[in-house]
Amino acid sequence: MAGDLNLKKSWNPALVKNQQKVWEEEQQKLDELKRIKERNQEYKQEQEYLELLKLQHGDQFQIKDLNKQQKLKISKLNWMYDDVPFEGNEKVEENSSGFIESNVEFTDGKSKVENLLKGNHVVGKKRDGSGTSDRINKIIGVGMTKSSKVSYSDDPLLKIKQQQQQAQRVARKQHPSDKHSHRSRHSSKSSSDRVHKSHEHERSRKHNSSHTRHKDGSPHR
């Protein structure tokens, strides 16, 4: 008895490829619904914040009447002005544009130089082995996880290169006499070649002299 011929039809819903298409469309609709909910939540939060501003400044308030942080929050630009957390003993100043200013970069190392000039060998700030200050390391490390900081050491190509260099160093340490033996063999070969050439030259000189005496009629001994 022949099987179900409907399984050979491309429109059959029992086929795996058709079920996969249905599942993918359902996932797309779920993602779209999730994005719509997120936008509605953001809009709701904005409306609540505007209601709070109306209670604080009145119904007819204008943007110019708000302070700096409120303007940035309404325009959704406050995340651009979030600076690195400063050290406890560092003085924080803000300019008219809302940027945080610090004079630590200009005065960094001043106390150390003054102490050296006075004869007091006291290190002013703690530094690491590379010579960079803690503040610079803090700024560089913002937004980086522990795994991302050590990602450079996990580079497979770098590891392969290091292994090759290590193998070359070990080979040079294990066979230090190969180079000298090669030089000695080369020097012995060159000296033997010079001796052989000198013998050939001596034989040719004797042969030429005997041939000259034979032409002159002198008796050949």
Curated annotation (Swiss-Prot):
Basic and acidic residues: compositionally biased ranges: 191-203
Primary location: nucleus
Assembly and interaction partners: Associated with the spliceosome.
Record function comment: Involved in pre-mRNA splicing.
Coiled coil segments of this chain: 14-56
GO cellular component: spliceosomal complex
Region (Disordered): 145-221
Biased composition (Basic residues): 170-188, 204-214
GO BP terms: filamentous growth of a unicellular organism; mRNA processing; RNA splicing
Lineage: Eukaryota, Fungi, Dikarya, Ascomycota, Saccharomycotina
Family: Belongs to the CWC25 family.
Localization (cell): Nucleus
UniProt keywords, alphabetically: Coiled coil, mRNA processing, mRNA splicing, Nucleus, Spliceosome
Gene that encodes the chain: CWC25
Pfam name, any one: CWC25
S-S bonds: none
UniProt name for this protein: Pre-mRNA-splicing factor CWC25
